[in-house]
């Protein structure tokens, strides 16, 4: 049925390895618990494919399945193509009715983002001022529903770009490369903490620094994540090795309870303050 509420839409394919799959469903459940607390009026949409097994009891309101004839192994070998094609199909569906935030599975939502939607942008992105990284991180993308044809064209172009890349980038990073390419691969090394409004190809962008809307905990000299309180960012993104701190942060800092329970999706029962 069509969505009647703002939504968080999370793309995730079930990994072929059973242990890894369970771990990522645990991440999903932790992420969902933070959304239920900070954004109780929002829906949670899982974006996946027809080859993915979705566990019973997963905390989501809608499961959107993009049709595939490939094996799951083949899908993971072209994961970025699978992702952006799923985005493309989702935003062409009747589930896209209200303000929507595309999110990765490995993040915690600390603040309601929907007051950011003021009708003045079509796509909202988060940029980094670190020149060693891709200009944009695709873990948080804001999508306004006011101009659906513009949104559809945007994701068509993202798909076209990703499919033009070689196998390495079709498997990883191609989404971020395409997003940056559509803005001519900008350099924001001196831009932070500015919030930037920009128009290109009839599409209105709003760009937030990652430290405000898509923050990752710092790494030490040995590239190990540093556990620390980060209360200001709207979203905490536990990329890479930081994933090992996600449950700890939810429990110790955000006050959630987590109990191992093999009978629930992800193997952890997550509860806490509302």
Which residues are covered by each model-predicted region?
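A structural signal for well-ordered alpha-helical segments within the folded catalytic domains
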Residues: 26-29, 33, 81, 85, ...
């Amino acid at each position: 049925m069509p969505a009647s509420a703002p939504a968080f839409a999370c793309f995730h394919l079930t990994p072929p390895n059973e242990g890894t799959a369970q771990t990522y469903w645990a991440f999903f459940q932790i992420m969902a618990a933070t959304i239920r607390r900070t954004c109780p009026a929002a829906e949670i949409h899982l974006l996946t494919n027809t080859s993915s097994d979705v566990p019973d009891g997963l905390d989501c309101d809608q499961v959107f399945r993009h049709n595939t004839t490939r094996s799951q192994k083949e899908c993971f070998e072209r994961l970025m193509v699978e992702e952006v094609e799923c985005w493309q199909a989702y935003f062409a569906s009747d589930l896209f009715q209200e303000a929507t935030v595309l999110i990765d599975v490995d993040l915690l939502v600390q603040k309601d983002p929907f007051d950011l939607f003021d009708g003045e942008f079509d796509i909202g992105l988060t940029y980094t001022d670190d020149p060693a990284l891709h200009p944009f991180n695709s873990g948080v993308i804001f999508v306004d529903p006011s101009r659906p044809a513009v949104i559809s064209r945007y994701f068509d172009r993202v798909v076209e770009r990703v499919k033009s890349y070689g196998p390495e980038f079709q498997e990883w990073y191609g989404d971020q490369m395409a997003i940056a390419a559509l803005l001519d691969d900008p350099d924001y090394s001196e831009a932070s903490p500015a919030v930037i409004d920009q128009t290109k190809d009839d599409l209105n962008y709003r760009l937030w620094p990652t430290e405000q809307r898509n923050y990752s905990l710092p790494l030490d000299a040995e590239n190990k994540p540093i556990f620390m309180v980060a209360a200001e960012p709207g979203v905490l993104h536990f990329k890479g090795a930081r994933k090992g701190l996600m449950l700890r942060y939810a429990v110790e800092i955000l006050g959630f309870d987590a109990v191992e329970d093999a009978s629930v999706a992800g193997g952890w029962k997550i509860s806490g303050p509302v």
